[in-house]
Swiss-Prot record:
Disulfide pairings: none
Similarity-based family: Belongs to the LDOC1 family.
Superkingdom in the source lineage: Eukaryota
This protein's name: Protein LDOC1
Organism: Bos taurus (Bovine)
Record key words, sorted: Nucleus
Amino acid sequence: MVDELVLLLHALLMRHRALSIENSQLMEQLRLLVCERATLLRQVRPPSCPVPFPETFDGESSRLPEFIVQTASYMLVNENRFCNDAMKVAFLISLLTGEAEEWVVPYIEMDSPILGDYRAFLDKMKQCFGWDDDEEDEDEYEEDDY
């Protein structure tokens, strides 16, 4: 019985050693693959965006429709970057300057729920900066995510 246990222990130790060697080899392969991936990623250039980066918005009412179209178009072609309403609103906020930037500060300070609701945020912007929706605009926004 003792001899059998010694043989079993010896077999287990041999298996352990073989697995340790295999594990070391796999770790080395993983390290090489990570390095190769990094090298390949440095060589890849992301495709250029067909829609230019939107201009900033300073609160000038006549520019609000243009601003909304520019930002919506940009977010549409870069949809992987704008996966939820909070990201969309944050993007819009990053482009606000002047009076428009001053307008949004209280919403940020009170961590308003509107910061996570893209459509509600647009509606508030339209109310504040004087753009009245007609029925056609409302139907268009109901069809789109932007």
